[in-house]
């Protein structure tokens, strides 16, 4: 793994007090807002039209809270116990499984054309993107095989298991270069990026696995592909989707595919603005190769994902230890707000991002 060329800020106190640990655990527990909201929705279904739509207010509230969020630049202690923060990830994994099970059950037992189905599609998709995939991203960077396995399961539940191979051995090696399909170019709009990055990342994952097996150019019918993780992921994720259709009906299948689509759209929207317009110089990664945000709400709701510069410098560093980097360019909003800008206000998105690149003399202004 490449390391940063610029010295990163020092940590806070060498050892956190029990009170500080409890404070951080409580703050990071904000990540349960979306999955617990989805759980509440499923457990109280069926709803009337207005009652169902009211559950989407959690997404609106999250957007407003993120937009109004104060900055968080405090550095973590050098030593924090791992188990309380790891427990948060395991609980997120469990909630994702439970919520998806309840989604399928609801689709199998209720009229598909109720407002509940639309809200379930949106709410579960948002939860899968902001909770399931975020937990998967953290777990796939851990060394323990069982944690990596949990990450692959979570990605398979949104029909995107190949992301595991591409992200670790593709994106983290090629970030900010023309060879990285997950890095957005200067001036690129999200819709164009999405159409480019999805097939590019799949091709990258396929080639990386083929290379691991001995031949990057092996044909599709090569028996060695039976050992490809990408092939395993395709078989398992689509096998599960087909089984859901057969056992629970077409309505459950449609909602399953629908929540996966929303989740992947969110994932790639985050990928879009995390490196938009940045051009890496040289073989080593530095803090200026990723966009950060100081949003307090994003930091704790998305388990540290927003400290992206430090993550790329030290990919195995657990989320509670990630540091704020003054050198990295700063997003004009938190992640929830940035998704809105990228999807609904592309001209404003480009204007604000370009201004920051000019101010820091990064990207095409270097």
For the regions a language model picked out, list residue spans one by one:
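Generic signature of intrinsically disordered, low-complexity, basic-rich segments
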Residues: 1, 73-74
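Cytosolic/stromal cytosol-facing helical appendages immediately following the last transmembrane segment
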Residues: 2-41, 144-147, 151-152, 156-230, ...
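Intrinsic disorder/low-complexity segments
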Residues: 5-8, 13, 55, 66, ...
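Alpha-helical bilayer-embedded segments of polytopic membrane proteins, i.e.
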Residues: 19-68, 83-108, 115-129, 225-269
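Juxtamembrane membrane-interface segments at transmembrane alpha-helix termini
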Residues: 63-73, 131-138, 161-164, 266-275
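Membrane-helix boundary/interface segments in integral membrane proteins
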Residues: 74-77, 209-210
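Intramembrane catalytic core of multi-pass membrane enzymes that act on lipidic substrates
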Residues: 76-198
């Amino acid at each position: 793994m490449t390391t940063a060329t610029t010295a990163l800020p020092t940590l806070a106190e060498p050892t956190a007090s029990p009170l500080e640990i409890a404070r951080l655990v409580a703050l990071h527990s904000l990540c349960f807002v979306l999955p617990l909201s989805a759980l509440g929705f499923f457990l109280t279904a069926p709803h009337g039209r207005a009652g169902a739509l009211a559950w989407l207010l959690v997404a609106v509230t999250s957007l407003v809270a993120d937009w109004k969020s104060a900055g968080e630049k405090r550095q973590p202690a050098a030593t924090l116990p791992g188990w309380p923060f790891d427990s948060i990830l395991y609980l997120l994994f469990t909630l994702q499984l439970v919520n998806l099970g309840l989604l399928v059950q609801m689709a199998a037992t209720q009229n598909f054309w109720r407002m509940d189905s639309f809200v379930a599609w949106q709410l579960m998709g948002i939860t899968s993107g902001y909770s399931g995939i975020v937990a998967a991203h953290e777990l796939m960077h851990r060394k323990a095989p069982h944690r990596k396995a949990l990450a692959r399961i979570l990605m398979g539940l949104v029909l995107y298991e190949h992301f595991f191979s591409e992200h670790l051995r593709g994106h983290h090696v090629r970030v900010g270069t023309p060879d990285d399909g997950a890095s957005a170019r200067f001036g690129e709009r999200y819709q164009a990026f999405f159409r480019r990055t999805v097939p590019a990342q799949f091709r990258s994952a396929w080639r990386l696995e083929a290379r691991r097996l001995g031949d990057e150019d092996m044909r599709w019918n090569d028996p060695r592909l039976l050992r490809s993780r990408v092939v395993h992921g395709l078989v398992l994720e689509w096998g599960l989707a087909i089984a859901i259709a057969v056992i629970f009906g077409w309505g459950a299948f449609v909602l399953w595919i629908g929540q996966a689509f929303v989740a992947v759209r969110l994932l790639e929207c985050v990928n879009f603005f995390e490196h938009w317009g940045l051009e890496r110089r040289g073989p080593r990664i530095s803090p200026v190769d990723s966009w950060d945000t100081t949003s307090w709400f994003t930091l704790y709701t998305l388990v540290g994902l927003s400290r992206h510069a430090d993550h790329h410098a030290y990919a195995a560093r657990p989320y509670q230890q990630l540091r704020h980097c003054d050198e990295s360019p700063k997003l004009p909003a938190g992640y929830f707000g940035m998704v809105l800008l990228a999807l609904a206000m592309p001209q404003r998105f480009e204007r604000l991002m370009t201004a920051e690149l000019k101010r820091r003399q990064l990207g095409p202004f270097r």
